[in-house]
Amino acid sequence: MASMQKRLQKELLALQNDPPPGMTLNEKSVQNTITQWIVDMEGASGTVYEGEKFQLLFKFSSRYPFDSPQVMFTGDNIPVHPHVYSNGHICLSILTEDWSPALSVQSVCLSIISMLSSCKEKRRPPDNSFYVRTCNKNPKKTKWWYHDDTC
């Protein structure tokens, strides 16, 4: 537990002092707990999400960084994207099977920025309705199938 807290403190400071472009730590979210963070995000200029505001929820287990964080969009504005379900779940391999303890909150944020920035057309995944009705609340419990950068 102590190593997890030490690692999270280090990552928290890094996110506060040198956040990825368009991202800021929601300071209120970490006042009472180190294991759940909200990161505010603004869509990058020149993208289909330019100027839009989103929130990412990070939840860390006691096994972090050996276990990936649970990451999902939350709040009133979930991005419409082929890899983002309307309940906020994100189909991104580094959040599950491609996770490595060498990755960090910063690297997850950069991957999500990249994923959104490369989108040319706002649309939901084809199985959105079925998935949202039948999925587990924890996106890490989903068995994702990754095919050529699509889910």
Curated annotation (Swiss-Prot):
GO biological process: cellular response to misfolded protein; DNA repair; proteasome-mediated ubiquitin-dependent protein catabolic process; protein monoubiquitination; protein polyubiquitination; protein quality control for misfolded or incompletely synthesized proteins
Database matches in InterPro entries: Ub_conjugating_enzyme (IPR050113), UBQ-conjugat_E2_core (IPR000608), UBQ-conjugating_enzyme/RWD (IPR016135)
PROSITE patterns in alphabetical order: UBC_2
Entry annotation: catalytic residues: 91
Localization, UniProt: Nucleus
Leading EC class: transferase
EC number of the protein: 2.3.2.23, 2.3.2.25
Catalytic reaction list: S-ubiquitinyl-[E1 ubiquitin-activating enzyme]-L-cysteine + [E2 ubiquitin-conjugating enzyme]-L-cysteine = [E1 ubiquitin-activating enzyme]-L-cysteine + S-ubiquitinyl-[E2 ubiquitin-conjugating enzyme]-L-cysteine; S-ubiquitinyl-[E1 ubiquitin-activating enzyme]-L-cysteine + [acceptor protein]-N-terminal-amino acid = [E1 ubiquitin-activating enzyme]-L-cysteine + N-terminal-ubiquitinyl-[acceptor protein]
Family assignment from sequence similarity: Belongs to the ubiquitin-conjugating enzyme family.
Lineage: Eukaryota, Metazoa, Chordata, Craniata, Vertebrata
Keywords associated with the record: ATP-binding, DNA damage, DNA repair, Nucleotide-binding, Nucleus, Transferase, Ubl conjugation pathway
Pathway: Protein modification; protein ubiquitination
Pfam families found in the cross-reference section: UQ_con
A Gene Ontology molecular function term of the record: ubiquitin-protein transferase activity
Function: Accepts ubiquitin from the E1 complex and catalyzes its covalent attachment to other proteins. Catalyzes monoubiquitination. Involved in degradation of misfolded chaperone substrate and DNA repair.
Gene Ontology CC: nucleus
All residue ranges annotated as the UBC core domain in the record: 3-151
Name of the protein in question: Probable ubiquitin-conjugating enzyme E2 W-B
Organism: Danio rerio
